[in-house]
Amino acid sequence: MDKHKKENLNSNFIKKYPLIFKKYRPIRKIASGVFSEIYGGINILNNEKVAIKIEKRNIKNKYLESECYTLFSLRNIGIPQVLSFGHNKEYDILVMPLLGKSLLDLFISKNSNYEFKDICLIAIQIIERIQWVHSRKFIHRDIKPDNFLIGLNDPHIIYLIDFGLSKKYQSTKSGKHILYSESKKFTGTITYGSVNSLKCREQSRRDDLESIGYMLIYFMKGRLPWQSVKVDNKKESYLRVSQMKKSILPEELCENLPGEFTDYMKYVKNLKFEENPNYGYLRNLFVQLMKKQGFEEGTCFFSWVNINNININNIKRQMKI
């Protein structure tokens, strides 16, 4: 579809639905996926900037409805707040506060070169985010740089988004863990997906953590070895990438990186299917790595945060430092 046609579709939606739930005005499309689109807009009652996520009501799997349920269950720092959820004749609609750039967009804007302290701070926060998600008995299943956004008004906070593919790994009532299976459809993104997910095995907490590892290595090196794999057939692509990920040793994958990255990958790759990860150990790897480089947690901030415009004590309270 050419750019002109896309713009027409964009403007047609906004013309057709100029006001959502009598107070949210969509202004422009900011993202789109296989099943959903996201529009930036405002709450006309208070001028709050919002993100309006829509999904066709006639699809079989209600990803947006599932995402809304998950977000309600996960309410906490670094998780998008649900402002409104409902539907019209055509769409299910989820309204959330508008967030800032993704970690991928920020990385690209910095010429694919984050400062070292930024990567350590990113690691600490995203491990905390996934620990919280797991503590609520959910797994995310699509960890990637695109799904972590900084706050619009609180750029010191990283938000984990897009819970449409998340699922419960443990029953809240019985406490029973989901069963291991080797006959699942692949869920996630090939570049960051775990070896087990690419082999169509049931995912658990270890898989989210493995994906985080690949993401951090990508930020350190600017590229992952399997990103050069190019095949037309998806199944062949899954097979090739999973073989590369399985065969490459952590020491080789993390070559020329601080040993903490190797330690991280060794730990998460050795986790059992139902094992409860030691998040404190993983988080502390990067706290100690920062200290080695002369940075103290709580006294340094992301390079994109203008500390002259923010209240440091308020940040520390928010981050529980």
Positions of PLM-derived features:
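ATP-binding glycine-rich loop module of kinase domains
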Residues: 43-65
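Activation segment/activation loop of eukaryotic-type protein kinase catalytic domains
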Residues: 151-187
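Activation segment signature within eukaryotic-like protein kinase domains
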Residues: 122-123
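Conserved N-lobe ATP-binding subsite of Hanks-type protein kinase domains
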Residues: 37
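Structural motif in protein kinase domains
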Residues: 99-108
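Catalytic-loop of the protein kinase fold
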Residues: 134-152
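Structural motif at the C-terminus of the N-lobe alphaC helix and the adjacent alphaC-beta4 loop
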Residues: 69-77
